[in-house]
Structure formats: structure tokens, C-alpha cells
Swiss-Prot record:
Residues 1-200, 750-800 are annotated as: Disordered. ATP binds at A265, R266, T267, G268, T269, G270, K271, T272. One of its GO terms (biological process) is transcription by RNA polymerase II. The keyword Transmembrane helix does not apply. GO terms for cellular component: cytosol; mitochondrion; nucleolus; nucleoplasm. It comes from Xenopus laevis (African clawed frog). It is found in: Nucleus, Nucleolus; Nucleus, Nucleoplasm; Cytoplasm, Cytosol; Mitochondrion. Belongs to the DEAD box helicase family. DDX21/DDX50 subfamily. This is Nucleolar RNA helicase 2-B. A motif (Q motif) lies at residues 221-249.
């Protein structure tokens, strides 16, 4: 038995200890103790405790120190305290103190002694834990510890060495308590003390990394560190801005001092305020009289009308004294001419309309002191370079040192943009890059997901995607590649339960403004837009962005995904891609530094969960007086169907889930269900799974299994089965120690499909002639060939 073996070991140790006690030094020490010659005893202790034991064997100062300070939680300090409690056997008083401590520890009468006992229980070698002072075992352990103290020169190492011995003493104490019937109170106190210590450590680490970053941002962006007027601070606080964001705090002094700057920052980080606040302060400090008909001193050019309107509203919210005008196409010239005659301080607009006003309506730009080009990469990419150059030529001179202050802002900075900077800026211009070449260029507050989906199934599953990731009351922007596609989805997408409206270039400017205003105010939940809404628009609280097609360009994806996750909020961006579009995702990943998380369509369980949550929220909006009229019918329904069934049916009807359509989680095709076959060992080839499946379900099962693929961890496979074949397959299948057959409710991570290719649809590429794993498809147009030639022998062949 373990106890017997332990007793034998202890007996063996006690025999060795007896041999040690036969040496003349301990006898002489014992005789001196009885004679009370304490001076000689101290000298011997100095000789024996070269490694630091003299402090532990001087009982008088230790007993005095042990009562004053609070108990120490560190193990080394606890061991030192326990050693300090061991009295000198030469005086009888310390032994009485031991017994008194033991008695008080059992009766829980003294809080300080209780703490010492519980701490000594952690160290395992406190004298207060000895149940019977007459037993010689503690004295032997004490001498053994003294011997180890001689051999140890480091106090920390001494504690580490004595730790296993302390545990051994604790075990002896436990066995004695079991025989004598003593209560294990010290053990309980040990557990409580450790729990309290762990709780204290958790409290010290309350601030997460994100909270610490926010705290640092608040300190760095405190208004008191910047020359901002009280009126501007008051206006900013009215908008909920209590400190400057990192991009604003890092660029404020540079812009305020009049230097030229090129700024690259992620979307949604507050670029508008980064140039708006310092320029407002510069113009407010200018003593120039605000005469009627004055020429603008600041011009801000944007690529889109919507961005120009947004910047105008932000500037007007910061200052009431300075005049802000916004000029863009699609609006009457008359109002803009009146604004010119009235006088302008900030001029915001698109290049086309401003150029027309300069040429035909005598818009004076000779007084410009500050020029801002926002989203400059898009502005030059869409063909505004000539118009911008024509506008700026009025004020810019060959000598760049005499030109106005020039500020370039963008989320992406191609190499050619720095050539533009050299053309318009002074030689000593500054670069502020908050993105970096190797870091993630997309918004870090956005989760990037990708769902593989055939083109014919996209409209059918779009409603489930919006429902799960945004809900019935969240805001969603769906980006399309064409105006026609945006219009069709907004009018004919039956899967969308939320109200939706389109936004594209064919709409009149007044209609576009009405649509954006309604979306901001929550009049409708889904905005289906082309690239018009991708740049610069700050629409608050957008929960979800959906790209109806795979992103073709990295810069376009950065701006589209940046419509969510703005101003510190989190968001989700989902890209729907077809099997042949996978290479587009890889290009975006390489260029932006993000990683798409491949997921399947939302499962029926997730859709039902989200719909039920929205239905429950909608119940709170029903007035109490209306509920009174339905209580009678509700009671009848409960009596007829039962409360649970009746309420579940009501929630299903409210959420619109009146029918359930089974769909594949692999490609969203209707009428299929996805199965996961888990393996107990890793597999690296689909043939292992096919062999096991055919052994149980027969050779003809390959016509019933479609789109088989390996799981990412190689611990199984995933495939689709027709809904009508599922029941018979379940009845014929029996789980084994190696394979487990389950119906998939949420798509697991899978490996890249071996049958996928990076070319366009309905095309095949030759090679080794590998047969595709979709066993239904026997067409020659989708199978590989021998390679090298056209036609049946392989090579390249167009689908018919």
C-alpha cells in the first residue's frame, strides 16, 4: 500500500538521521542547550550556517518580526517565515508558543496565526502543523533542512530544494489526522488562499490589449495637446468626438504648420477630420476680414459627389463662422453662382463642375492657400487628372516653394501617386503612412469572409447571408459590378426579407441624395450599390458588406470593405465567388495582407436562430393596448396546440420561415445535404474514403455522392448527397472505430478542391487527365486530357 511504502521510506530516513545524530557536534550542542550557554550556541550557528541559516536560527528577532508584517504570498517568503517560526530548543518558551499556535490554529481564534498556519500549509513545513509535539519526526526534518541549508548557497535554490520535503511532511500530517480524527482546516485555508491570490492576479490584468490601446489613443489625442479653439472643441464634442484619433493626432501639427503632406491610412480612420480641424483653426486665426464675394482660401477635390457632400457636412459641423460651399455636377448652376458672389472660405467639390465654374462663371482661385486632394488615387485613376491639372494651374507656379500647401490623402498609395506629389508639392514634403508596405492595408476592424457559390444560386442564398450576419434591423451594403445587376437585386431578389434600394450612376443626383439620406436614417436596411458608394462615404453603423462577385482589384476591395468597421466599430465583409474565381481572392490576399476565412452558407439552424432573435425583438414594439385584443385568440391557440408549439409557430411566421429548403453547404445547390465523414486517423487521399464508403454502401454509391473534398485537418472528408438519398444511406451505414457519419450543420474548413481551376467557366485544361471528383459529371468538356494538344488528347478546349 502507498502508506506502508511511505512509512518504510520514512523509517529508512529516520535511521540515516540517527547516524547523523551520533556525531559529537550535535551532542555538544544539546549539552550546551541544556546548560543555557547561548553565546557559544550563536557562534556555532554562525559556523554551521555559512550559507545564510543564521537568520533562521535566531528565534528572538524572527518571532518579533513575524507578528508585525502581513503574511507573504510568495513561496520563498513563506518558507522563510516558516523557518523563522522554528524556536531554539534551549528555551522552553518557544515550545509553548508552538502548542499555543496549534491550539489557536484549530480553534480559529487568532486571525494572524490562522494566516501563518495556512501559509505554512502552502510551504508544508510550519511547526504549527505538527499534530503531536512529542513525535521526533519534525525535529529530524528540521535537521535535514539545516543540512540542506548548509549545502545550498542561494536562498531561492534552498526554497526549491525544501519544497518536495515540505510536501512530504504534509502527507505525514494528513495520514496522522486521518487516524486521530483531526479536522483538515489548514488544507481548506490553503485552497481559499490560492483562489484569492488567483482572483487578485485576474483583477490586475483587467485591462485588455484593446482597452490599453484606446487609453493610449485618448492620452495622445487629448485636445489640450493641440492648438484647438474652445468653439471648435465644443462643436466636436457635440458630434461625440472627445479626442483626436491616431491619424488626426499624428498629422495635426504637420498640417497646422503649413507643410505639404502625403497621408496613407486605412478607411474609416477619420481622414476628413485630420485635415479639416487644423485648416479650420488656421483660417479662424487669420485676421483677414470676411468680406462678401471673397475668394476661397481652401479647395478640397474629391472623385465622387457623395464624398464631397460628406466632407462639406463635416466642415460645417466644425465651424459656424467660415463659409463652406459644395459644387458638383447634376445640380443647377444658379445656386452655386450665388454662393460665389456671397463669398467662400472652404470650397469642396468634384473636378468637373469646379473646372466649368472656373472657365465660365469666373470662380477665382488665385487666393488659394491650401489644396486638399482626397482619395487621390481614384481621382487620377478614373480620368480626372487633366481636370485637376487645369484647375490647379490657375494658382500653381513653376517654383513649387510659392505654391499653396498641398495635402494628399488616400487609403492606397500607388507608386505613380508620388510622381503626382513631386509635381505639385514642395521638395521637402512629409509622408505619414499608417498602413505600411507589409502590414494589412484593409481595415483591421473588419472580418473578411469568402463563400463559394455558383452564379445561379447567389440570389437565392443572399437573404440567408444578410439575415445571419446583419439581422432584420442591421444595415447592409451589397456591391455589384453593374447598374443592371444592382437594379435587379433591389427589385427581384425574393430571398431578401429586408427592404432594399439601389444606388448607381443612372440615378439623378437628387435621387441619390434621397437614397443615402434614407439609408443613414434607417428608412431601409439594405443598400445595393455599384462603386459609387465605395469611396469615402461614412455611413454610420454598417454591420455587413457583401461583394456579389469576387473582388478583381485589391484597391477596390480595400475601399468596399472599408464601408463597415468604421470609427472603432467591428464589421463583416463577405465575398461571394465562383469556383473559377479563387485566384482573385489569392491576389487580394497577397496585395492587402488579409486572409479570407472560407465559410459555407449559413445553416438552417443559424438562420432560424437569427430569425427568432429578430422576431423576439419585434414583440417588444407591440403596444400593450393592442395585445389586449389578441389575448382571447392566444388562449384558444394555447388550448388547441399547447403553449410551446403555438409560440414557436408564431415566431416562425413572424420571421418569415414558413418553409425550409435544403441546400448544399459546399455550393448552395438546392436539394442537397452536406455530409461529413470523420476519420480517427489522418488521410491524405480521397481514395481511402471512397474505399470505405463502397465497402458499406456498395459500388454504385459513387453516383449518389458529389463534390467530395478533404477536410483541412485531413481528419475526414465532406461531400453532398441528394435529400432523397440521405435516408437510405443512413440506414445502410454503420459507424466504425475509424469512420463516423454525420449530417453537417455548419461547413468545416476544407482543403482547396483538387478539381478546381483558375480559368474561366466552361473551359478545361489538359494535364495528367485526372478525373474530377464530381462523379455525376461525365462530360468531356470538364475532364482533363493528356496534355499538350487540343481536342480529346488534352490541352485547351472550350466548353460547348
Amino acid at each position: 500500500m502507498p502508506g506502508k511504502v511511505y512509512t518504510d521510506e520514512m523509517e529508512g530516513k529516520s535511521i540515516k538521521k540517527k547516524k547523523l545524530t551520533e556525531t559529537p557536534l550535535p551532542k555538544l550542542k544539546k549539552r550546551k542547550m541544556q546548560n543555557g550557554e547561548t553565546e557559544d550556541l550563536d557562534l556555532e550557528h554562525v559556523t554551521e550556517s555559512v550559507n545564510g541559516e543564521i537568520n533562521n536560527n535566531n528565534p528572538t528577532p524572527k518571532l518579533k518580526k513575524n507578528k508585525k508584517p502581513a503574511p507573504k504570498s510568495d513561496l520563498s517568503e513563506t518558507a522563510e517565515q516558516c523557518d523563522g517560526e522554528q524556536p531554539d530548543p534551549s528555551t522552553p518558551t518557544p515550545k509553548k508558543v508552538k502548542k499555543k499556535k496549534l491550539k489557536e490554529g484549530k480553534e480559529d481564534s487568532d486571525a494572524q496565526e490562522e494566516t501563518n498556519i495556512s501559509l505554512s500549509s502552502q510551504g508544508g513545513q510550519c511547526d504549527g502543523e505538527q499534530p503531536d509535539p512529542s513525535t521526533p519526526t519534525p525535529k529530524k526534518i528540521k535537521k535535514k533542512k539545516l543540512k540542506e541549508g548548509k549545502e545550498d548557497s542561494d536562498a531561492q535554490e534552498e526554497t526549491d530544494i525544501s519544497e518536495p520535503q515540505m510536501n512530504g511532511v504534509k502527507s505525514v500530517k494528513k495520514s496522522k489526522k486521518n487516524t486521530t480524527g483531526d479536522e483538515p482546516a489548514p488544507k481548506k485555508r490553503k485552497t481559499d488562499t490560492s483562489e484569492i491570490t488567483a482572483a487578485n492576479e485576474c483583477e490586475e490584468k483587467e485591462l485588455t490589449k484593446e482597452e490599453e490601446e484606446i487609453k493610449k489613443e485618448k492620452i495622445d489625442g487629448d485636445f489640450s495637446k493641440f492648438p484647438i479653439s474652445k468653439d471648435t472643441i465644443k462643436n466636436l464634442q457635440a458630434k461625440g468626438v472627445t479626442y483626436l484619433f491616431p491619424i488626426q493626432s499624428k498629422t495635426f501639427h504637420t498640417v497646422y504648420s503649413g507643410k505639404d503632406v502625403v497621408v496613407q491610412a486605412r478607411t474609416g480612420t477619420g481622414k476628413t477630420f485630420s485635415f479639416g480641424i487644423p485648416l479650420v483653426e488656421r483660417l479662424s486665426e487669420d485676421q483677414q476680414p470676411l468680406a462678401r464675394g471673397r475668394a476661397p482660401r481652401v479647395i478640397i477635390l474629391t472623385p465622387t459627389r457623395e464624398l464631397a457632400i460628406q466632407i462639406t457636412n463635416e466642415l460645417r459641423s466644425m465651424t459656424k463662422k467660415l463659409k463652406v460651399a459644395c459644387f458638383y455636377g447634376g445640380t443647377p448652376y444658379q445656386q452655386q453662382v450665388f454662393a460665389i458672389k456671397d463669398g467662400i472660405d472652404f470650397l469642396v467639390g468634384t473636378p468637373g463642375r469646379i473646372r466649368d465654374l472656373v472657365q465660365n462663371y469666373r470662380l477665382d482661385l488665385t487666393a488659394l492657400k491650401h489644396v486638399v486632394l482626397d482619395e487621390v488615387d481614384m481621382m487620377f485613376d478614373v480620368g480626372f487628372s487633366e481636370q485637376v491639372e487645369e484647375i490647379l494651374s490657375v494658382r500653381y507656379k513653376p517654383d513649387p516653394e510659392e505654391n499653396p500647401q498641398t495635402l494628399l490623402f488616400s487609403a492606397t498609395c500607388p507608386d505613380w501617386m508620388y510622381n503626382v506629389a513631386k509635381k505639385y508639392m514642395r521638395k521637402q514634403y512629409e509622408k505619414v503612412d499608417l498602413v505600411g508596405h507589409r502590414s494589412q492595408k484593409a481595415a483591421i476592424t473588419v472580418e473578411h469572409l469568402a463563400i463559394e457559390c455558383n452564379r445561379s444560386q447567389k440570389a437565392a442564398v443572399l437573404g440567408d447571408i444578410v439575415q445571419v450576419y446583419s439581422g432584420s434591423h442591421g444595415k447592409t451594403i451589397i456591391f455589384c459590378d453593374s447598374k443592371l445587376q444592382a437594379h435587379e437585386l433591389s427589385t427581384n431578389c425574393g430571398s431578401l426579407k429586408q427592404s432594399a434600394k439601389p444606388l448607381h450612376g443612372d440615378l439623378q443626383q437628387k435621387e441619390r441624395e434621397v437614397v443615402l439620406k434614407g439609408f443613414r436614417q434607417g428608412t431601409f436596411e439594405v443598400l445595393i450599390a455599384t462603386n459609387v458608394a465605395a469611396r469615402g462615404l461614412d455611413i454610420p453603423e454598417v454591420d455587413l458588406v457583401v461583394l456579389y462577385s469576387a473582388p478583381k482589384e485589391a484597391d477596390a476591395y480595400v475601399h468596399r470593405s472599408g464601408r463597415t468597421g468604421r470609427a472603432g466599430r467591428t464589421g463583416v465583409c463577405i465575398s461571394l465567388y465562383e469556383p473559377w474565381e479563387k485566384h482573385y481572392l489569392r491576389n487580394v490576399e497577397r496585395s492587402t495582407g488579409i486572409t479570407f476565412k472560407r465559410v459555407g452558407i449559413p445553416s438552417l439552424m443559424n438562420v432560424a436562430k437569427s430569425s427568432s432573435a429578430d422576431a423576439i425583438k419585434s414583440l417588444d414594439t407591440v403596444p400593450a393596448d393592442v395585445i389586449e385584443h389578441f389575448k382571447e385568440y392566444a388562449q384558444e391557440l394555447i388550448e388547441k396546440k399547447g403553449a410551446l408549439t403555438a409560440l414557436a409557430a408564431a415566431l416562425a411566421h413572424i420571421s418569415g420561415a414558413t418553409s425550409i429548403k435544403q441546400r448544399s453547404l459546399l455550393n448552395m445547390e438546392a436539394g442537397y445535404m452536406t455530409i461529413t465523414l470523420k476519420s480517427s486517423v489522418p488521410i491524405h487521399n480521397l481514395s481511402y474514403a471512397w474505399r470505405s464508403i463502397k465497402e458499406q454502401l456498395g459500388e454504385d454509391v459513387d453516383s449518389k455522392i458529389h463534390r467530395m473534398c478533404l477536410l483541412k485537418d485531413s481528419m475526414g472528408v465532406c461531400f453532398d448527397v441528394r435529400s432523397e438519398d440521405l435516408q437510405s444511406m443512413q440506414e445502410s451505414w454503420s459507424d466504425t472505430r475509424r469512420w463516423q457519419f454525420t449530417i453537417t450543420t455548419e461547413l468545416p474548413e476544407i482543403q482547396e478542391s483538387e478539381r478546381s481551376f483558375d480559368g474561366p467557366r466552361n473551359r478545361s485544361f489538359g494535364g495528367r487527365g485526372r478525373r474530377p471528383f464530381d462523379r455525376r459529371n461525365n462530360s468531356r468538356n470538364s475532364s482533363g486530357g493528356g496534355g499538350g494538344r487540343r481536342g480529346r488528347s488534352g490541352g485547351f478546349r472550350r466548353g460547348r
